Amino acid sequence: ISLISLLGITLGMTALITVMSVMNGFQKEVRARILGVASHVQITSMHGKLSNWQLTAEEASKHSAVEAAAPYVSAQGMLSHNQVVQGVLVRGILPDMEDQVANFANTMASGQLDHLVPGEFGIVIGMELARTLGAFTGDKITLISPQGQVTPAGVLPRLKQFTVVGIFEIGHFEYDSGLVLIHMADAQKLYRMDNDEVSGVRLKLHDLFAAPQVVNELPALLTLDSFISDWTKQHANYFRAIQIEKRMLSLILALIIAVAAFNIVSTLLLAVTDK
């Protein structure tokens, strides 16, 4: 009986270590995938558009924890191809600066990020979105902007044809199916923004876990009134769900070990009583 009890607690401990290792690895992998394309810290304007982004990026980069900064334009849109229409989040970027804050270069299934050239209206889309639209590198697709044009016939949405110059596969459905990248200059033209206006500035930190502290310290360095957020708030629900799952698994496995330990104690008590 004692051997069986010992075997039970051994299996329980093995299960605990294995499951916790898998969950920790899963959390680390998910975090790496999400934060590979999302920002550690994000600076946006209180008024919707951030003017003079160069100043904001320069001031933020003075913080010792900041590794790189890059501007972006973010807006809603719809893509149309092969009579299929799909809503997307359009992100206008500067490819050379984006490489410093994101990991898109290592996720490209075809094409390259630096194929986004201002004025040529190229677009990089996710693998799931490409499958939905039936689009391949080199295809022409139509981007529909919700900011319409006023005509005698009424308000009409703005349409612009883009060429697919790349397809990325991050491994996260939300991004692979709903995010597209275009050059920031093309995004500014499409959404009628001035050359020095952007949606915000994205920051990459040397230590991503220092993000909450950096958010508290950055306002002292910035001249313009800005709203600053970090990845722990932007993706809080997702990582909180993983943490709750880890705790519940730990509780269940701890109960298994407790039962096995109780069996050992009971066996020892019986042995002592018999003697």
Regions found by a protein language model. Give the residues of each.
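Hydrophobic C-terminal alpha-helix "anchor/cap" residues
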Residues: I34, E59-S64, L218, L222
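Short aromatic/hydrophobic contact patches that present stacked aromatics
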Residues: H40-Q42, G122, G200-R202
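Mechanotransmission and gating elements of multispan inner-membrane complexes involved in transport
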Residues: Q147-G148, V155-L249
